[in-house]
Structure formats: structure tokens, C-alpha cells
């Protein structure tokens, strides 16, 4: 039976692949496809570009060149720079190519047309020129969105690539130390692109490099997942170089939530002056009044400055949140039209892609491109039910009665080709996790509401539900209240997920009943009047007498507030005997 089902599913998938390929051929092209929308968002986000070359000129070229006046030939080996691997589609005759000097005036003007600031650095000469150029490139590129490097900046041909490799290595280490960042590095060269790629891969082994698409280096190292090095041919002219840099940057960020993130950051940057105008220095006296009010209260005096800080941050956060919620650019990045275009983009990248739905614990059901698009845009109930009834059908849950009810009652997992449980766990963890060992920075954990700990003795997990006001100004041994939460396998029913330390994710089933409440006594830090964790064998721990609790992270405020509310509701339930006839009349 299972074998027949597998064979049937295989036939359905093969049929769907043919339909998907046909759909990509006959589909009507929308005014702006998903990649174009992503490129527009990326272009608005990019602010800074750095270009480094040994042959930079800072004056405008005297003459322009017309296509009809040019007879372009690919350089041969006699140039001493190797054979060019450029294709005819990469050549543009509107401007001189990069085999000549890099004209900063033209480069900066091309980026300026897109409201992007471009800085240039000319390689140093002299005995220590290489090292000085590496240091200067590193310093100027640390905060740049895009760095453009010439591969051949050295006087000695045998040393070609030393400056580029040295600067890139320092940037990669800087990004790893800072837990990663979005970074694109472009290298233009007259040498064979595969040769340069191999040289780069051999140089950066500690960062787990891999050659992708025969043109770029990506990294398996987790902190460098948003960094790539792209190698292009010097025959590319300046205008094409600018367009290529934005295009490659877009390939790194082209996604639904990543587009929304870029649009949100751009919106915040654009509103910087608006926020400074609103929170201007004239409000300083009013803020000091708030601090004085806290200091005047005996109950708040010891932590007045921390409370005032939280108040200020909440003000700023709410203001930014309000702006993002009404931002047309952010809304557009996740609009209905964008969601409609997204499946087309996935199929265009790989026509062999199969979309699947998994409803609850049932088998995966493959669906066509057009069916996915209709489900994403449907608003009418009967139309929705008709789409669900199409072949291949979703498995009907006997307790639900209809496929539409099954769709409503069970969790829905959308899949591209293979099982993507990890991606769903990641989004769940992002929703739930406020802090963990990876993103805590210099923060030393404090025991308070929302903190998740593991008791070493029995390996059980607990979340602190102590009221926040009872977690500060602690002077002596104090009871802290916890709720025991069950760690469950990632494939089992769960209510909360956080990023783990020894494992990628920790999934929990939180039962707010009173039977799971647990209490332990802790001594506070004498100076801070709070229970602070201490570092032991690379882990933060809290000690309650002989009991040791490992700090695993913290839930975000809405998450732990919801848990506390559920516990309170459970404790507030009232049970009493009543007249059965009257009780049953309630329904």
C-alpha cells in the first residue's frame, strides 16, 4: 500500500513539473516581477560603496565614445594579464572598460544617480604599500555595504591578489567577531575567473568557503552566511559594474521577510531627522523630571536610572513601530501583489521546483504554481473550498468533516521541494527568543520574568514567572516562582521554540496548570540587589542552595506575558458544586 502511494505521488510530481514548466512559459508578465521589486528595495537600502584600485583617476574623461566608432576586441595573452573570459553579453560600448584606469568621477556619478555614496581609495606605493593598502581598505570597508577591489594592485605580477586577499580576510574575521553582517565584495580581474576563485578559496579555508555558480565564493561558516565575494571580468564597463553590484546585492537579499527588513531599515533611516525633531533636546528637562520622580519614590530609588532607561527605550521603540506599521514601502514589500509574484520567482529560478502543502501530520500534497497563487489570493469562501477540492486532494481529517475545516483546524506547512521543518522552527524561535548565549553581547543574565533555565539535577526546564517588580530591590534570600515546561522533540506538538546552545532549537510544550509551579530560593548580588548569573565553564548559572540552574535564554515580553496570563487564569478558576439541571441548561 505504501509502495503504491509512493509511486502515485511520484507520478503526480512528474506531472506537476510539466505543468509548472508550462505555466512559466504562458504566464502573463506582471508590471514588476519579484526580483525587480527586490532590486528596488535593495537599491534604496544601499548607502555606501568603496572602490579600491591602484589606477584610479579622479578627473573626468575628455571624450565620450560612440558605439559606431568602436571595434571591440577581447585582449589576447600578450597583454600579460591572462585571457579574458568575458562573454559578448557582458560587453557594453557606451563607456571604456576597466582594463584602463578606474575613473572615480564616472563611478561615483553612476552610483550618485542611484542616491548611493561611493568612496574611492588609491593603493599605496612604496615598500610597505601593500600592507598600508590592506589596512586602509579594511578600515574604510568595515561599514560599507559593497566593496569593489581590483585583483591586480601589486607591482610584482607574482603577487597579484595579495592586497585583495589580505583585506578580505581581515573583513571576514571582523564580521565573524561581530556575529556576522550583510556584505558584498566584488573583485574585477583580467585573469581567468576560475583561477581567482580557486586562489580565494585556498586563502580562506578557516571560513569554510565554497565556489558557487562559477563566479562567486560563499561561506558555510554561520556568521558569514550573508557575505559573498563575486569575481567579474575587467571588460565590464563602469555603468555595468554599478548595475552588476546592485544585482548581486539583490541576489543576497531577495526574499519576502528579508525585503521587508531592508524596507523597514530604510524607512527608519529616512525618518531619522523626523525622530530627532520629535525627541529634541528641549525635552531633556521633562525627561529629568521623570528621573527625579522615580528617585523621589523610596520604592524606586535604587533602580531609578534603569527604570528611566526602559521608559526611554519603550518611547523610541513604539515610535519606530508606529512608523513601520504605516510605511507604504514596508507594506508594499509584503503586499498581496508581491506574494502573488513570489511563486513565479521561485519557479523561474528552478523550473524543477515542486510546491507542497503538509496539513497537520498528513502526507505532503504537491500543488501547481497556479494553485498556490490562487490560494494565496483567494478571499471568497466558495472559491477557497473549490481550490482545496481540486486534484490532488488534501487528506480529509475525519473529525473535521470537510477539507476546508481540516485546513482551518490543522497547522499548515508550506514546502519547497523537501521538508523544511528547520525554517519553521527558525521563524518560531525568532518570534519567541529575546536573548540567548549567541546574541547576549556583554549582557550578564539576571533572574526575572521570562528567563528560561535548566535544572542540572533532573535536566528539566523552567520559565521564571516572578513579577518583574519582585525581581529587583532584592535584599536577602528570596523565593522565585517558576513554571515547569516540557522539552519536546521538534516534530511533536509544541507551543514555544527558542534558539538553543548545544542544539539549534529547543521546543517546549507549556502547560500553565498549577501542578507545574515550582519555587526556589536565591541570594541577590549585594550591590545590584538582583539575582545575577555567574559564568561557569562557558555557561551562565544561577545557584539556589545546592541546586544549579543553567541560563538558556529569555522569552520576549509578549510571549512570557502570555504565559503568565495563562497561569493566572488557571489559578483563578473557581470550582463548586451546583444543581446539575441548572448547570447543564447553560448550553
Question: Which stretches of residues belong to each language-model region?
Answer:
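Phosphate-binding/switch region of NTP-binding enzymes
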Residues: 466
Amino acid at each position: 500500500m505504501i509502495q503504491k502511494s509512493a509511486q502515485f505521488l511520484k507520478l503526480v510530481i512528474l506531472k506537476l513539473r510539466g505543468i509548472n514548466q508550462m505555466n512559466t512559459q504562458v504566464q502573463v508578465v506582471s508590471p514588476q516581477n519579484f526580483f525587480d521589486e527586490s532590486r528596488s528595495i535593495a537599491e534604496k537600502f544601499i548607502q555606501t560603496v568603496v572602490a579600491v584600485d591602484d589606477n584610479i583617476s579622479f578627473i573626468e574623461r575628455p571624450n565620450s565614445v560612440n558605439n559606431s566608432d568602436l571595434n571591440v576586441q577581447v585582449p589576447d595573452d600578450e597583454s600579460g594579464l591572462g585571457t579574458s573570459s568575458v562573454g559578448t553579453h557582458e560587453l557594453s560600448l557606451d563607456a571604456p572598460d576597466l582594463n584602463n584606469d578606474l575613473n572615480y568621477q564616472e563611478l561615483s556619478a553612476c552610483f550618485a544617480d542611484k542616491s548611493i555614496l561611493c568612496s574611492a581609495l588609491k593603493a599605496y606605493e612604496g615598500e610597505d604599500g601593500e600592507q598600508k593598502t590592506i589596512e586602509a581598505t579594511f578600515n574604510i570597508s568595515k561599514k560599507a555595504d559593497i566593496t569593489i577591489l581590483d585583483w591586480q594592485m601589486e607591482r610584482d605580477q607574482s603577487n597579484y591578489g595579495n592586497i585583495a586577499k589580505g583585506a578580505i580576510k581581515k573583513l571576514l574575521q571582523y564580521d565573524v567577531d561581530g556575529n556576522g553582517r550583510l556584505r558584498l565584495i566584488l573583485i574585477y580581474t583580467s585573469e581567468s575567473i576560475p583561477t581567482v576563485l580557486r586562489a580565494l578559496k585556498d586563502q580562506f579555508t578557516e571560513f569554510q568557503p565554497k565556489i558557487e555558480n562559477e563566479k562567486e565564493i560563499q561561506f558555510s561558516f554561520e556568521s558569514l552566511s550573508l557575505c559573498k565575494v563575486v569575481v567579474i571580468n575587467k571588460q565590464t564597463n563602469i555603468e555595468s559594474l554599478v548595475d552588476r553590484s546592485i544585482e548581486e546585492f539583490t541576489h543576497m537579499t531577495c526574499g519576502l521577510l528579508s525585503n521587508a527588513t531592508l524596507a523597514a531599515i530604510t524607512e527608519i533611516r529616512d525618518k531619522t531627522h523626523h525622530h530627532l525633531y520629535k525627541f529634541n533636546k528641549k525635552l531633556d528637562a521633562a525627561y529629568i523630571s521623570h528621573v527625579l520622580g522615580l528617585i523621589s519614590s523610596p520604592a524606586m530609588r535604587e533602580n531609578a536610572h534603569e527604570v528611566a532607561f526602559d521608559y526611554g527605550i519603550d518611547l523610541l521603540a513604539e515610535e519606530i513601530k508606529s512608523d513601520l506599521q504605516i510605511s507604504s514601502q514596508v507594506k508594499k514589500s509584503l503586499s498581496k501583489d508581491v506574494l502573488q509574484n513570489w511563486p513565479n520567482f521561485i519557479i523561474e529560478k528552478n523550473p524543477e521546483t515542486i510546491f507542497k502543502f503538509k496539513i497537520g501530520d498528513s502526507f505532503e500534497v504537491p500543488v501547481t504554481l497556479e494553485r498556490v497563487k490562487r490560494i494565496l489570493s483567494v478571499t471568497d469562501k466558495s472559491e477557497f473550498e473549490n481550490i482545496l477540492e481540486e486534484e490532488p486532494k488534501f487528506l480529509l481529517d475525519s473529525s473535521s468533516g470537510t477539507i476546508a475545516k481540516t485546513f482551518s483546524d490543522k497547522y499548515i506547512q508550506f514546502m519547497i521541494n523537501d521538508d523544511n521543518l528547520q525554517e519553521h522552527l527558525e521563524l518560531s524561535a525568532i518570534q519567541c527568543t529575546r536573548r540567548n548565549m549567541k546574541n547576549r553581547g556583554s549582557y550578564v543574565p539576571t533572574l526575572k520574568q521570562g528567563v528560561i533555565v535548566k535544572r542540572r539535577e533532573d535536566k528539566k526546564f523552567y520559565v521564571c514567572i516572578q513579577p518583574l517588580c519582585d525581581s529587583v530591590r532584592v535584599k536577602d534570600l528570596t523565593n522565585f516562582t517558576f513554571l515547569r515546561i516540557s522539552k519536546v522533540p521538534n516534530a511533536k506538538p509544541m507551543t514555544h521554540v527558542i534558539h538553543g546552545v548545544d542544539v539549534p532549537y529547543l521546543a517546549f510544550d507549556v502547560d500553565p496548570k498549577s501542578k507545574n509551579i515550582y519555587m526556589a530560593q536565591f541570594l541577590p548580588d549585594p550591590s545590584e540587589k538582583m539575582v545575577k548569573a555567574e559564568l561557569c565553564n562557558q555557561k551562565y548559572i544561577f545557584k539556589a542552595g545546592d541546586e544549579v540552574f543553567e541560563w538558556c535564554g529569555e522569552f520576549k515580553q509578549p510571549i512570557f506575558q502570555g504565559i503568565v496570563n495563562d497561569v493566572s487564569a488557571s489559578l483563578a478558576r473557581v470550582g463548586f458544586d451546583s444543581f446539575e439541571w441548572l448547570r447543564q441548561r447553560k448550553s
